[in-house]
């Protein structure tokens, strides 16, 4: 491990493994599961994992901004960390943490979840780590240096026909018609229950693509999007635009203003191998 952002990568890997140890300890041994909104839950594993990750980062980078799913912004808001305060430059150094992506799976004893830790420099993701403790599998990427699984480089699958593709999707109510329209055009669709893992899997060719029209937060995307991109996938927003930028315009800003300060889930994703990405984008626009 050498080169730019070596220390950030080392800290992220160490933090993710600490969180993973907590999750292994508590998996199928939870005493309480607390509802969080209509579709989500939060557990002791989320809180303890997040505290462990933040502690590991603070020990080495005490001045960095942190945005975490459960505790929110530490010294910065979500929008400031990505887009900067009122349109000025983004925060120079910011970490985006989802301590346990796939909490519903975790709470129900389904071993599909991960810790996701991303680091962005002036609003641009440059380090990403996903750790799946159930498989002891670590995906990581550094911008410009490719992506790896447990230290072994990986890349997107070779080009193939859309009808051979396995797509990751999210089965939210507003997206069901689109999923139904896509289903006959591909081999199969799957909702893994962890957006971060699904996006990372595109970079490693386990999935050929992932589509989510909204409902994503920066901590879902920072690490996973970079890993997919460094694995050779094309990563964009659902409409083909930049993937780590909040939608612009008064309506988009008003919608985010109605969200709690650290829960602006206004991002989207379309991730696939380059040739497949273009076909999927055309289908979604059609």
Q: Positions of the model-derived regions?
A:
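Oxyanion/phosphate-interacting regions
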Residues: 1-10, 14, 180-183, 200-286
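Residue-level signal for inorganic ion chemistry
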Residues: 19, 23, 46, 57, ...
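Residue-level detector of anion-binding/catalytic polar loops
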Residues: 22, 63-65, 188, 208, ...
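Short secondary-structure junctions
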Residues: 29-33, 185-192, 234-236, 286
